[in-house]
């Protein structure tokens, strides 16, 4: 029997183990036992995953998830609050995804929780994309990010797994009630942690349940004091949650709560395991709140008074009570009492503490828990011990006192002889045993009794009291200024239970009370109209009256109404049409007037209808019985009475009512004489569900800047294309009236058709509105805020205002904000202070807001290319459901500080420089571009179209199977590029691995200028792994080469823009042709299969099948990953794939050839196609996708002038797109000064095209025709770009609107606050002069000149008058330090500048001085302090801050001084308005003065040669006042032009024709170091003696050596310092800049390689090339007394010349058509053009070139050089005193040099023979280039050796080569070899060079090369030693 019972117990244990709760992570045995005890015997089983940080809290989460799945198992629709992907995935398994929804937030903690979803989404295709979007914080149909109380998904059941914790702003009980009302939810099952400490508000550390909780008090005022609960895992507050303690405790305290939504909330605690609680939240229909009474004894708790707090009441950190386990506490008390009684000795405090520690553990006997773990904080143990000890002492004292009183009674009884003998004995025993000090006992006892009752065996918490019910909001004094702070903190609190909950019902009842009055008014109006003969209107009113007669309001409480509101022109009506376009029942639009009805009726289709207000009542009531409308839209609802909306609801009860209106426009007006006083719509607007619009597309920016508009709409944003519109007219000026003009006036009614007043054009728009205000009735009408609002917001183009009142009452009323009492009540400290604006009128045409910058930026803004966007963009993709709020991004998601300064133009915020490491923004861009629905065509339809497309491509492009040699060359070239990027051949082995197919998505650092109204997404790069791209790179290169060989097909990607322009222009001039430009960039919905199959068809000729399969697989499906998320992409294109350009070009060109008929030739590049031919027309029926393409996505330019990539095409000429170039220039941000300088060089190179008169004329004509502007505007842009490209770094502030980095100096804080700063600022405040009076600077000029007359001439400073009424900057005299005097700035000796004249800065504040960082390489002069106010620092997230102040400026239109002509004649003259403090204003006009550098005047007695020219002088117009005058006097420069030349360093001595510096002798150099004329040292300073260099001579020498790449042992004969000269780009060597000899150096990041001599690898800085002539022995050779130049060349690039060898500036860059960044030219795949890569050397200096291996190559002396312009004169400006020598250099892949003993002419021969075998090539005779020609009798070169290159990518031996001798005999030791099929140059190598000749010798080369390629196609390792280097 015993065995059987044991067996049964074993089986029972096994069954229980099988039925145990399975965890997914590992848990210890102790943790499982605690969980089993907590959940009352429930078995748990450990998992296999790694445990989480807080295991016990994780167990609670798993239990809650499993329990909630039981509730959603059989319901049709599931809504989860705070969803997890696991729960949603489980819900989707049993129902459609559309029936599952989750509401969450997108704050930081939620992003952290959802972060891993982006990486795990790929294994669940059903919800993977939605989960990835959730990780990025983007809403979808499955997940929303606005919270439970802001969503409308309908579901009767909802679940919440630990997601209802309040954070102070959401998830309170009232928020949950609001969410239940919106979602239609009746039941919510929720699990929460509700610790009992929420009732006691005491800190606790519970080790048994694994949590810790702390409470902190917040709130400054008594009415706002709250407690926040900090909840975390046990003793781990690193990841704690912060909740509102009072709201959190409300789930425990309340069982029923009234809500204002027509129902109450009932809260039922269904289960409670420790603190883990399950709630059931349901709707209730009975009112009244229910609270809970908690006896703490039932919870097993006891409150023990803290004796430390009693003895030290001022100890604030001490708690008043210690809440602990009652059973454990009583056990300790029993032990202490027993110990005292047994021993008779007092127990010590240490013994009590020790015993408490022994009771902390749990006691388990026979599997039964007898005592639980005692959860008590460490700091509470001693407090508890003290309290227990004190309690026992008090109890003993009480006992002793009782015995003492008994003794006294015994004694008195003994005296009376009434006690028996035994009692007498007891009395004697008491007397013997106890000696009690009665006074001491009394004091102790009284001290304890004075305290509160300190033992609460059954403490009752009454939730009705104020102390335990702080969830009821306390309302503070409303009119007190400080109380508003508390009121804001309480704005989301739960309303009081005593507050009336029927406010909405009362509002509707009040509206319905007017029904009878409204109906009677309609009856009277109907009779009146019938008597007047207007039968139609009378019938309409009678029908509306009948509907009103049937309307009753019994039982009507709240009516569900939507209210859409926003500023004028925000698109409310426009948004309603697409929103309700697909409804089956149709929409009824209600309009206030017939005019608006007719306008709406044009775009409404059946079954929707448009009616006026009264007719709509009859129509809605009539159709409600048959086919009711789904939605009724009441436009301009503010113009209706409130009862009208209720009537419409009763007329069609099933229809959804949406009201559109604006509370700040004109409301309901009663035109009858009855004065019915109907309630306005505003009384029910507060009870409607409101949707707000804050973007206006109609109102221009200057209207938004008006104080009256700012007050009414403080958050409004304008996307209007019109920047300025308000014009103020005088009486003498009038405006020509057109049919688009309206007159708003009373006295003009008889003269206007139709007559209108200010309120009548509401809801209408016109182009021009002429607004007169002069009569008394007009002023009375327009002084009302709502009427003014309507009058100012009806126009779209211009608003002319003429104020004919005597005192000018209208303009001040516009500049004054309206009274707050007129429309709403707001606390005092919330009022907005208007910006102070000083109005300056000129010629009666100036107004308060008509001010903007006149210059290149303004022209681009007028053309719509640049837009002021206020830094806000709306991000919305198709995945965002219509029921959710849009996600608004401010353009800069990361809130951290900038890591580097930014340089940009201040007027524009439409573009930004983004951080490529910004993970959040990268993920937003990723999902925004790829998370869109793709309606791709089927493969069957695609195959039909592919046949047509490929047939046309065969006719135009000679595609042929690739030859093995071509494949070998392309593959070797690709391998070389991969090796340069750090990859090797072994990487191909991981070709099919997950790592090899990984695609990383990064954000582009420089975003393009985009139109903000089109809401385009950002730009990113999809970086494919290089080992994946290597597979198809060779075949892509072959396809591109074959496309480039076609005569009729122009592949623009393989050549520069200039070459493409020349070819297209020549083709068009052959004969008259039609031409069209097509862009298919946005055509990405149906062409996926077509483009894939077209590219696969081309690759099928020679490409292996597995590579084609790989391409199709990657094109159809792939995963793009960013750092914090990934997106699965299907079919859409990637910008980073190696095949993107070729694939797009093939598809676009083939598609156009198949669709168009009559094409003669075609040019294509990517998505852009240019077609030309006779009778061009589109035949869409030729392709199945043609009709859809032509109707929707194809952008065809059919005008006479079209744009194609970066230029403009017309029949006359093909020119550059100046507007496009200017947009990229002025809309670009620059991250550092170096990039800015390189970009300027690129712009200067582009501007060379504009120097030809014909090219300039045709460019102006083409651009003006294309963009619809004038030629003057285009000429102005060309001049501005030319000036931009030639401005020095030190003169950047002369560019239009440019902002440069500034460095604020230290300044005392008293400048900004305190009396000192105010007094100092008051001294600088100066009054503006009246017209004709001298201003403060003129007065200063006079005083300065008067004082200067008393000083010496050398210290005098002449102030030159300026045409704008101010003073020019001083003209410096020799020997006088330079001083800057700028506009509005007064420099002081203490480093501060006063008298600021900057917009956005308070004039009372002084500003610190600034020191501008000069150009790199120039040492800053410490005595030269620049206090220019024209420059400020730009950052990405706080880009509008003015340095040195706390103010921000939205825009700052700085002066335009670098242009060659005034922009005012080409644009309309602007109005001068000076804003002193404006945070969000428009542009100000800073053109008056302040930015002019001083003129370099030739002094008397100096020859012209004394001022050497470093560049051509330019005539620059300096903008002055419009009348070109100064103080009413005409200046000598009356034309507004002065001659400005470039500033020279002050330490250059002026000689005759050259700039010379003194020589300095360096220690240890062995000779003098001569600095050539006009050159600088590496520090940027002239080469003076050592005393001129404070850093010392040795430091300069070391830096000099580092920059020249010269070792310590190389300091000797003539060194040439390398110069980085991106300006040449292989175009013109003469433009190398200032310097005697410039050697273009290689990349600065030169890698360290092994060679014989040590190299110094310091980065070369940009500077002028210097030649150092020395006489010294080196490497054991004596230099025969002549100077020489040594050049080190980097082997990685294999070239001598500029960085851009093979990549000219005029070639296209990777950024579409953007000017190339000269310093970042990395495109080495383009074949080298002729005549590029020149080596310069001085006259008469032999040059020797040494490679990395130490081989010295003598090139001989370089003399007698000519170029295409003839012999250079000695006084050349660019190379003064020197000639230049050009060495033709071809690019190859390795720079190994050898000696050639035979006589060879200098240069590299062109070996392009395609013949095979041993056919000899011609002799090497001469190098013939356009830059220089060298004959056979070149003197000293004949006896020297020339460098001949050996390329590393040798493919095949062509045959022997002959030398340049007389007999032309072949040299058997020399072999001609070619690389890349002869594209990049050829070379020779010697047979004795064993490293090269072993593998590639004569007959072996061809066989080994072919064998190597075949082996490589099977396995990379099989090539063995024959693998290419």
UniProtKB/Swiss-Prot annotation:
Composition bias type Basic and acidic residues, residue spans: 1319-1329, 1355-1427, 1482-1527, 1540-1552, 1578-1591, 1672-1682
InterPro entries tied to this protein: (+)RNA_virus_helicase_core_dom, Alphavirus-like_MT_dom, DNA/RNA_pol_sf, P-loop_NTPase, RNA-dep_RNA_pol_alsuvir
Keywords per UniProt: ATP-binding, Helicase, Hydrolase, Nucleotide-binding, Nucleotidyltransferase, RNA-directed RNA polymerase, Transferase
Q: Which residue ranges does the record assign to the Alphavirus-like MT domain?
A: 45-252
Q: For this protein, what is any one GO molecular function term?
A: RNA-directed RNA polymerase activity
Gene Ontology BP annotations: DNA-templated transcription; mRNA modification; RNA processing
Please give the organism: Nudaurelia capensis beta virus (isolate Pine emperor moth/South Africa)
Q: Which domain of life is it from?
A: Viruses
Q: What is this protein called?
A: Methyltransferase/helicase/RNA-directed RNA polymerase
- UniProt feature, compositional bias: Low complexity: 1626-1636
(+)RNA virus helicase C-terminal domain sequence ranges:
694-834
This enzyme catalyses: RNA(n) + a ribonucleoside 5'-triphosphate = RNA(n+1) + diphosphate; ATP + H2O = ADP + phosphate + H(+)
Function recorded in the entry: RNA-dependent RNA polymerase replicates the viral genome.
Q: What is its EC number?
A: 2.1.1.-, 2.7.7.48, 3.6.4.13
**What are the disulfide bonds?**
none
Q: In what ranges is there compositional bias, type Polar residues? A: 1342-1354, 1905-1918
Domain named (+)RNA virus helicase ATP-binding: residues: 533-693
Q: Where is this region: Disordered?
A: 737-760, 1310-1445, 1468-1636, 1666-1727, 1806-1847, 1905-1925
- So what family is this one in? Belongs to the ssRNA positive-strand viruses RNA-directed RNA polymerase family.
